[in-house]
């Protein structure tokens, strides 16, 4: 025997063990004869603690528990819908709907009504291999109102494919059609209720909440869905979550329950959270809110789940207005014409009893006090609008429209025939009709896409006790705000419930503890920014070409800094370079014109042109220092200028050495001097120095790169300094060191030859040039070690131009002066006389 067969066998045993139905004459609140019967399961009396009475095979007596006004209101809605359909000529014409309704005591009485509905008129449920031709006494069941009961009943009805349309059970478990193939509902699932709550809290910027749940499946499942939803977003944090004690029916609060309530309220008093979300049946909240009043809580926001959001009994505790603002999620408000009068109508409808139907009663089909108690709450129920009532009303109409299709009804009559539950179930999935302006149908999960309302409790005499303030659409998953909220706070201000206040723009969140909603705000430092859509807890660094100030939410492009033409230093240096170029060109022409004269020969002859040409080229290449650096300009700075300068220095140095050799070494070391001159020692020296310099420069460039880069100005991060690669500075320092060595050598040789004939005594001119070169190079090295940025470029350019000017004017200037203004001294006779005078002084 399989598990399903064993379950059915157990159900049959239970059916025969339970009390037998009793024959009843006439109609009542719980019975109405008809051609097709609907079963109705409602909570008229509530026992929130499910006690298993099956252990001693007795059905609980529901009227021993507290009456639930809303439950009777919903039962009246089913009666009203059936009576309205029976009086309608366009829907099921000529067909009478009947009903059998049972009080399920919330949780205590679920199995017996399910078996009762499945049995036949003679209280018989046969064991068959095929139930496709089996006719239980009802074709569909409306209810019950809570998820636990709905699941219990569905586990029974699903074996027989009896359609079950619940009007208030929101658990997501019912969406599993493999487990609950016959379950449908006219209310959105718990996921949508939770989403509406979360969007409400996000709208009012409440990110620090307390969650209170009942100790049952309803509380646990909904709190789990809420926690899961909040974990996915991280926008809202739960300060703490507690379980509310479930009271025994008709019993005083036990000491352990009182201690549990006191502990919850003490934590609630000490927390900074001011928003409390409660998932619990309303009967579990009476003791809790009485304690809330006793503790004098004020300024809280209480968010109600659908199970107690529109409960008139809790609302009747008018002192609750002093504890804060009550908000709740419930089904949309749809006014049902005529229902408010029907709810408290005492007369019973009279219809002819079909011949094949014999009425009977079963347990928990009585509620003597229901009408009187409901009358006392009629004003609240009428003003609140028919919310869950419409869910019952639409469920009955969904079954009626399905029967209308199955019976092939036209405008005047229907074809009465046997309707099996599985036929009704198959057809009800395709039903689509308009009821009181709403288009109703079931989606693939069996849910009817009804709107949800966010309501606020009001206590004014003329006010709607459950005023709608917002609407939520399950299809769009969006909350639409339709009115303002009357906050029970000073100056009607929105209550604040935040672990930490929102950070200002440009401030990141530094978590405190385990909750992401608890943090301190830290300013994003310069060079970083905060993009909240990407990461609220870390400041992001700006790209290299961009910058930001403190507390910025975006980066901006930095200003590029380089040597520009319109700047004063550039203009001054350019003028000096132009003068140098012109003067060098003039010297070149003068020396070319007087190439055969003793003055030009004593200055070095052909070697003079070896100096003047690099000088001329160097002055002409000065513009490469101006403008954004490029690979070519960096190459010129690092290679061209330093090679030209080294050629000039090496020529001056070797020229000083050669003059000393002529007058000092020729007599003492004639063979060495002869070797020096025979193998063109001066040119070899210049070529060697040039080759060494070229090798150093090439090695430096190959080791790194000469590409220009942008670097942050240390004095102003908003500026990017465009310059050559930092290696350029290292190479410049190294090359300058070599030039300093040549300057020292040239100065030394010039000093040794200070006693030579006047025409050959170039000590003071070379000393001037070398001293200037030495001083400027030292200054440049010192400046580069201290400063950075465009100033280094300006200083480098200025030193380069001045060094070339010092060589050009310091070395060649006096000679041009003598050639142009003292031509009598530029003769061989004059030079010979000076040499003879020097020889006579030394002899």
From Swiss-Prot:
Glycans are attached at residues 87, 296, 316, 355, 372, 432, 484, 491, 531. It holds the Pfam family ANF_receptor. The lineage of its organism: Eukaryota, Metazoa, Chordata, Craniata, Vertebrata. Residues 1-19 form the signal peptide. Its main location: membrane. It is found in: Cell membrane. Forms heterodimers with TAS1R3. Residues 20-570, 628-642, 704-731, 786-789 are extracellular. Putative taste receptor. TAS1R2/TAS1R3 recognizes diverse natural and synthetic sweeteners. This is Taste receptor type 1 member 2. Belongs to the G-protein coupled receptor 3 family. TAS1R subfamily. The chain crosses the membrane at residues 571-591, 607-627, 643-663, 683-703, 732-752, 765-785, 790-810. InterPro entries: ANF_lig-bd_rcpt (IPR001828), GPCR_3 (IPR000337), GPCR_3_9-Cys_dom (IPR011500), GPCR_3_9-Cys_sf (IPR038550), GPCR_3_C (IPR017978), GPCR_3_Ca_sens_rcpt-rel (IPR000068), GPCR_3_CS (IPR017979), Peripla_BP_I (IPR028082). One of its GO terms (cellular component) is sweet taste receptor complex. Keywords: Cell membrane, G-protein coupled receptor, Glycoprotein, Membrane, Receptor, Sensory transduction, Signal, Taste, Transducer, Transmembrane, Transmembrane helix. Residues 592-606, 664-682, 753-764, 811-843 are cytoplasmic.
